[in-house]
């Protein structure tokens, strides 16, 4: 079979025009093209056909040093990456090349990053709780096995720390495989995560096949093409784990879905498409749907995904985070106001929700305690204007008691994290679901009305709060 060869005719930023004149065959849309810049392989993805003999492509790597006239080869297929157990313990980029300096990834399985979502008939509808060990999440917005979970928050409120703690609590205890896709985030954070995984044994450098995680990075310094496709590369590996050996349960972490949208917006602008609301690409909902519909569980295996989603200017109505909401089973909203109180994780207990907070799924006691906690916090929120203007003395005795309990609940929703031990000096806590429910049930029923507020701050179980109260006396 003769190779289809073209030549670069124009380079503008990350957009490259390639002319094919030899036999008039144009590469298909989404095909991967290859060219070489000083022996360095650069992959281009076909985005548009311009006229009869030219394609417009998006580069997956830096274009520095590339010139017009360079030969480009059509691979005849979309971007293909290695998948399967050979990827465990390794870091790769969007096109499947290793970036950890440990040699090639020798996998017999190569897969396209574009795949259809599983058929409706093959999808699973089971609902089981995934216990995270984080009180505020397990009580008020529980996660599901095989569900899609979104962590929403503005800049600097703790999305990445929360995702790292979930990796620590869930992935380490989880028997199956984990895939982490770093989409347009800080390289330093990706490096920290890699070394933490080595220290904790999730990545085994001596015997990589015993590792439990595969990492795919397309960080902030990458061109928009790479950032727009790296989530698909990570998802392709997660799908391969899900479908192997008659089904596996896979964890898929993405940090950050907003950067996927942002990169799509940059690519759209570079291709000259007319922007839609707030400057986003006109295909925003389609792009998000193509990614999210593939993150699903089948009758054989499951993908549980946890996605950090940056909220620009703390505005949840911005089109990027708003488009994500429709696809999620549970949303954990991180609030700047709660972070300002020094309560971490800064999860908003009234804004966060989950489809599985249902008495038929979580049980009557869990549901009842969660709703009582939210009721107390909502009452406190509605009384805050009166407290600010007139002071606590103007409240009725009943309202004073509600406020006192709400403040204790607020503090008890905080928790020291394992991954933050180096910053806080406090040992991390994993709290079982039964202990979480029992602790909050006692609080709303008034069992601990005599304990000081400070006793509930940054502790694990209610027993630790009682012990702390003894030391405060």
Swiss-Prot record:
GO MF, one annotated term: ATP binding
EC number: 7.1.2.2
Keyword Transport: yes
Membrane-topology annotation of the record: Peripheral membrane protein
Keywords carried by this UniProt record: ATP synthesis, ATP-binding, Cell membrane, CF(1), Hydrogen ion transport, Ion transport, Membrane, Nucleotide-binding, Translocase, Transport
Keyword presence, Membrane: yes
Reactions the enzyme catalyzes: ATP + H2O + 4 H(+)(in) = ADP + phosphate + 5 H(+)(out)
Subcellular location(s) of the protein: Cell membrane
Any one cellular-component term (Gene Ontology): proton-transporting ATP synthase complex
Domain of life: Bacteria
SMART domains documented for this protein: AAA (SM00382)
Similarity remark: Belongs to the ATPase alpha/beta chains family.
Protein's job: Produces ATP from ADP in the presence of a proton gradient across the membrane. The catalytic sites are hosted primarily by the beta subunits.
Binding partners and assembly: F-type ATPases have 2 components, CF(1) - the catalytic core - and CF(0) - the membrane proton channel. CF(1) has five subunits: alpha(3), beta(3), gamma(1), delta(1), epsilon(1). CF(0) has three main subunits: a(1), b(2) and c(9-12). The alpha and beta chains form an alternating ring which encloses part of the gamma chain. CF(1) is attached to CF(0) by a central stalk formed by the gamma and epsilon chains, while a peripheral stalk is formed by the delta and b chains.
Protein name per Swiss-Prot or TrEMBL: ATP synthase subunit beta
Lineage of the organism: Bacteria, Pseudomonadati, Pseudomonadota, Alphaproteobacteria, Rickettsiales
């Amino acid at each position: 079979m003769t190779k289809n060869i073209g030549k670069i005719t124009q380079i503008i930023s990350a957009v490259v025009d390639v002319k094919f004149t030899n036999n008039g065959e144009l590469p298909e849309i989404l095909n991967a093209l290859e060219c070489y810049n000083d022996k360095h392989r650069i992959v281009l993805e076909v985005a548009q056909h311009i006229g009869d003999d030219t394609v417009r492509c998006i580069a997956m790597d830096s274009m520095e040093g590339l010139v017009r006239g360079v030969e480009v080869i059509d691979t005849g297929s979309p971007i293909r990456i290695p998948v399967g157990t050979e990827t465990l313990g390794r870091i790769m980029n969007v096109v499947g090349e290793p970036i950890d300096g440990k040699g090639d990834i020798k996998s017999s399985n190569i897969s396209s990053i574009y795949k259809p979502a599983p058929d409706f008939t093959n999808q699973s509808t089971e609902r089981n709780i995934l216990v995270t060990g984080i009180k505020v999440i397990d009580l008020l917005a529980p996660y599901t096995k095989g569900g899609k979970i979104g962590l929403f928050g503005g800049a600097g409120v703790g999305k990445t720390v929360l995702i790292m703690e979930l990796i620590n609590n869930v992935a380490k205890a989880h028997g199956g495989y984990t895939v982490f896709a770093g989409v347009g985030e800080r390289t330093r954070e990706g490096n920290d995560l890699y070394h933490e995984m080595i220290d904790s044994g999730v990545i085994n450098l001596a015997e990589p096949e015993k590792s439990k995680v595969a990492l795919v990075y397309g960080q902030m310094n990458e061109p928009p093409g790479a950032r727009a496709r790296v989530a698909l590369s990570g998802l392709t590996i997660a799908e391969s784990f899900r479908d192997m050996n008659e089904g596996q349960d896979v964890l898929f972490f993405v940090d950050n879905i907003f950067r996927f949208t942002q990169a799509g917006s940059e690519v759209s602008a570079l291709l000259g498409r007319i922007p839609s609301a707030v400057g986003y690409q006109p295909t925003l909902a389609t792009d998000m749907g193509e990614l999210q519909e593939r993150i699903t569980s089948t009758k054989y295996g499951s993908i549980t995904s946890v996605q950090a989603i940056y909220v620009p200017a703390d505005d949840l109505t911005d089109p990027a985070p708003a488009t994500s909401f429709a696809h999620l089973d549970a949303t954990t909203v991180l609030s700047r106001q709660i972070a300002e109180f020094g309560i971490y994780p800064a999860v908003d207990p009234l804004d966060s929700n989950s489809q599985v907070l249902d008495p038929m799924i979580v049980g009557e006691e869990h549901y009842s305690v969660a709703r009582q906690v939210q009721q107390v916090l909502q009452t406190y929120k509605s009384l805050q204007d009166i407290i600010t203007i007139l002071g606590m003395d103007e409240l009725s005795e009943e309202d004073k008691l509600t406020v006192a309990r709400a403040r204790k609940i607020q503090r008890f929703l905080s928790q020291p994290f394992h991954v933050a031990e180096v910053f806080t000096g406090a040992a991390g806590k994993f709290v079982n679901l039964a202990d979480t429910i029992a602790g909050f049930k006692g609080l709303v029923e008034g069992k601990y009305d005599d304990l000081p507020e400070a006793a509930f701050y940054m502790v694990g179980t209610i027993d630790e709060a009682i012990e702390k109260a003894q030391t405060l006396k």
